[in-house]
Amino acid sequence: MKTLAAVATSKGEPLEMRELTLDETRSDEVRVKLVATGVCHTDAIVRDQIYPIPLPLVLGHEGAGIVEAIGDAVTSVEVGDHVVLSFPSCGVCGSCVSGHPAYCVDFGALAMGGARSDGTTAFQDEDGSNVSSHFFGQSSFATVTNVYERSVVKISKDVPLEIMGPLGCGIQTGAGAVLNVLKPEAGSSIVIFGSGAVGMSGLLAAVIANCTTIIAVDIVDSRLARAKELGATHTINSKNEDAVAKIRQITGQGANYALDTTGNAMVFAQMTKALGTLGHGALVGAAAPGTESPFDIGNLLLSGIKISMVIEGDAVPQTFIPKLISLYQKGLFPFDKLVKKYEFAEINTAFADSESGDTLKPVVVF
């Protein structure tokens, strides 16, 4: 069958709209008609080949849609179900069976291999050549796509499907890092470096956790203003003032918890300095391979500081995404305030607006 896709064809270049052939749905796959998909920073860095996957490639890993068909081995969803698409995992390795599928031993191959394990791709161009697929198990920048079952999360039909896609990655990453990993106590302090969609999701989670001091750090005043609206008690423009000194002034002895969503080496070092005794920091921002960060090992040791490296919020999507949706329905997790919708034909504008900071979470609607 045919599918319309936004295809990455050259390093750093805008995506191209192409009609592709979608192959048959395999036994462990679900064919999904996309309703919408988020645009994430990870899509941009793979488009730019910072993390190289063979081109041409259909990106997209925050899809939301309706199940059109299922493979013979699929048991978790049925035709007609509403679904959010998240990251893939094998389901049988030690990480998966212990409840940490984001650390699946096959994560790299399943999420960023560009093909199935047998080397086939789900998409073919008009000349019959292969187009890399299964990005994060889904490749959701297409009107219809084949998705690994373990990337599929069934959700209620009572919520607006158009905005649910970002729960599959960016929103899950920020909220999960706070709720699943940092687990701040009520009354504690937390500082969040970066006020993009991931950082704002962490901020919303900190509000849910009843943190009483929530500090947002960024270099864009408009994002800091939005952070204030969403629950930040303090904001710091680190371009204009010493963030670490200000954080220590606000908290007294350093923050109890910190989240770095930037992937910037210097910001990561700042995060370690901003934590107080027995503080716990988490890094979720993706950095280019080989990135190194200077930090004071002695300070970490003497202060008992703990640093966690967190992928996908250390979440089990099939349970965590419904939890976030339940919080959203109760008015406790208003992630919809981060979203701006774009038509499919505007996907490159969505990328540009995200990279400029004009839009927190672009969602492309089909």
What is each model feature region?
Residues 1, 241, 269-273, 277, ...:
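C-terminal hydrophobic helical "lid"/dimerization subdomain
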Residues 264-332, 366:
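Glycine-rich phosphate-binding loop and adjacent beta-alpha segment
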Residues 23-37, 50-97, 102, 154-158:
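Glycine-rich beta-strand-centered segment in the early N-terminal region that forms part
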Residues 87-150:
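Cysteine-cluster motifs in flexible loop/terminal segments that predominantly coordinate metals
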Residues 84, 256-259:
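N-terminal Rossmann-like NAD(P) cofactor-binding module of classical short-chain dehydrogenase/reductase
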Residues 79, 143-144, 150-152, 156-241, ...:
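Mid-domain Rossmann-like dinucleotide-binding core that forms the NAD(H)/NADP(H) cofactor-binding site
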